[in-house]
Amino acid sequence: VSRKITIVGNGEIGEEGAAAIAAADFVIRFNECRSYAASPGRTDVVAVCNTGRPAKAMLSSDTWRTHPAVMEAKEIWSVRDPEKFAGLRAPLAVSHPELGDFCDDYTSHFNAFCKDAGKEHIVVEKVIHEAVDAALATFDPAPYVVPSSGMIAITATFRRFPEVEIGLAGFSHSGWEWHPFAAERQLVDSYIANGRLTRHPADTSLSSSQGA
């Protein structure tokens, strides 16, 4: 029996996306799971930024710890390899001094949270991060700091589930200025074109170039 995975971003979820999430055998959400209200239900993984302010905010929030998606998830994926981010600290101090706490590592805190909550904690290895950087280079991205957690999670899902049908919902490819969202959209579109991914746009009347 073929399994269906849906990766759920925090952008707008349309009817098609909500239906895909409801029909999925495995659902991956992100960070604060902000799109959960529009697509409640199954959650197997919450992928988190385990460095910097997002990590600190989630770990210090009872709202996050008791969020229904976080409660249900069997696994937490930390998308930022501690060794990779330790290596970024010195160059970023020069190029982006305003990101002084960006590489602060909270992996051990997520480890403790998962241990207490009976969840598996998976740290996505830097080889995945570096594979994403290499794939994005094809699209000549503007200078960026790191790929988005969504792009890391998509690539990690490919590696873990090589033959499984994977759909995307709630991906707007927009947000923090130092993620390479334009190149990420092009990369995702290339995966869709070769049949590796399916996109469930928020508005099915939009063309693929404008959709989620």
Which residues does each predicted region cover?
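Metal-ion/cofactor- or nucleotide/acyl-coenzyme-handling active-site neighborhoods
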Residues: 1-212
